[in-house]
From Swiss-Prot:
Coiled-coil regions, chain positions: none
Protein name: Serine hydroxymethyltransferase
Primary enzyme class: transferase
One GO location term (cellular component): cytosol
Catalysed reactions, semicolon-separated: (6R)-5,10-methylene-5,6,7,8-tetrahydrofolate + glycine + H2O = (6S)-5,6,7,8-tetrahydrofolate + L-serine
Keyword terms: Amino-acid biosynthesis, Cytoplasm, One-carbon metabolism, Pyridoxal phosphate, Transferase
Modified residues (N6-(pyridoxal phosphate)lysine): K230
PROSITE patterns in alphabetical order: SHMT
Length: 417
């Protein structure tokens, strides 16, 4: 028999306990600017760390292949209903373990190996699962890639031209590092012109969409996929959404189970349900509005400091910075900022001459610092501190002085009180 006191993590595995404690310390002492990261609430983490992790539940609620699922059924049903309400759709599959799993299920549901897919190029801001040659999406399927125009917006003329030329079976509208707004209607018009399925990958902007501060892809898309963390502030996981298309919804059900997954992670699904409930609160709309304000505040300062922003600025939560003029690579800047207690990720920019392991850019975002309580004033300070370091990578004095300022700021805004 287990005892929660006797068999605590600290008593059972001191090495893992210490690693977690160090990560908790890092999260408190560093300003988190990685655009895909956020802080889950204590309620979300409590659900994810619950005894639901013990339960196997192959199948869907009400139709399981195991007994004893009556209570995990409650959790999954709540997660589905809340996701449907949040995004205004009549179908939601909450079982995908990740955004990539959700994307893979959609591929399996609507395509056959060798079918043509049109997605955003990784170097232009797309995701690996949008047809990158190193990913399943670029190996199993015939991947055609679109990019950005001279203004840093999606090149819709190119999308239309490529669609006409290659007749894709599916077009993906979505991104991993693009700071603009997607014109869902334009994509739908292009998709309809070649009889293609239009899929939206809203992993980065799902929270903004749910709050009504970023255009909703429905009714223009056939299906939307997303992660449940990032701007949604939930556990790490995936989600498939569909509306007014029961035939397609049925395909998505079987594409996840038994298609690419077995038992769902019921503790994660419960945590998703909690996150969706939190996102249905009016305060969540206020949060997303502040996310946008904070991103614009950083944009203003970074432009003043002479840092080039791809697409000329941001209309969402993230900024892709071209730091070529600093004389340092993205890899060097990421390391220097890390020493200064600012966490970012190096990122390729359009037509980047450097490899993806080095890069000429940085990707930053405002979701995590907004959750922390930062407003425009703090974000302007953070942007200035970032610029101080990026122009002086390797300068120990600048890095140490910045780290001290960051620690002072973080102490005023604890992540978990």
């Amino acid at each position: 028999m287990f005892s929660f006191e006797k068999n605590s993590l600290k008593n059972t595995d001191k090495e893992i306990f210490d690693a977690i404690e160090l990560e908790v310390k890092r999260q408190h002492e560093h300003v988190e600017l990685i655009a895909s990261e956020n802080y889950a609430s204590p309620a979300v983490m409590e659900a994810q760390g619950s005894q639901l992790t013990n339960k196997y539940a192959e199948g869907y609620h009400g139709k399981r292949y195991y007994g004893g699922c009556e209570f995990v059924d409650i959790a999954e049903k709540l997660a589905i209903e809340r996701a449907q309400q949040l995004f205004g759709v009549d179908y939601a599959n909450v079982q995908p373990h990740s955004g990539s799993q959700a994307n893979a299920a959609v591929y399996n549901a609507v395509l056959k190996p060798g079918d043509t897919v049109l997605g955003m190029d990784l170097g232009a801001g797309g995701h690996l699962t949008h047809g990158s040659k190193v990913n399943f999406s670029g190996k199993i399927y015939n991947s055609i890639q679109y990019g950005l125009d001279e203004n840093g917006d999606i090149d819709y003329k190119q999308v239309a031209q490529l669609a006409k030329e290659h007749k894709p079976k599916m077009i993906i509208a979505g991104f991993s590092a693009f700071s603009g707004i997607i014109n869902w209607q334009k994509f739908r018009e292009i998709a309809d012109s070649v009889d293609a399925v239009l899929m939206a990958d809203i992993a980065h902007v799902a929270g903004l969409v749910a709050a009504g501060v970023y255009p909703n892809p429905f009714p223009y898309v056939y299906v939307a996929t997303t992660t449940t963390h990032k701007t949604l502030r939930g556990p790490r996981g995936g989600l498939i959404l569909c509306n007014n298309n029961p035939e397609l919804a049925k395909k998505f059900q079987s594409a996840i189970f038994p298609g690419i997954q077995g038992g769902p992670l019921m503790h994660v699904i419960a945590a998703k349900a909690v996150a969706f409930k939190e996102a249905l609160e009016p305060s969540f709309v206020d949060y997303q509005k502040q996310v946008l304000k904070n991103a614009k505040a950083m944009e203003k300062v970074l432009k003043q400091r002479g840092i080039n922003i791809i697409s000329g600025g941001t209309s969402n939560h993230l900024l892709l910075l071209d730091i070529t003029n600093t004389g340092f690579s993205g890899k060097e800047a990421e390391a220097a900022l890390g020493r200064a207690n600012i966490t970012v990720n190096k990122n390729s920019i359009p037509n980047d001459p450097r490899s993806p392991f080095v890069t000429s850019g940085l990707r930053i975002g405002s979701p995590a610092i907004t959750t922390r309580g930062f407003k425009e004033k703090e974000c302007e300070l953070v942007a200035n501190l970032l610029a101080d370091v990026v122009f002086n990578c390797g300068d120990e004095k600048v890095e140490n002085e910045t780290a001290a300022k960051v620690l002072d700021l973080c102490d005023k805004f604890p992540v978990y009180k």
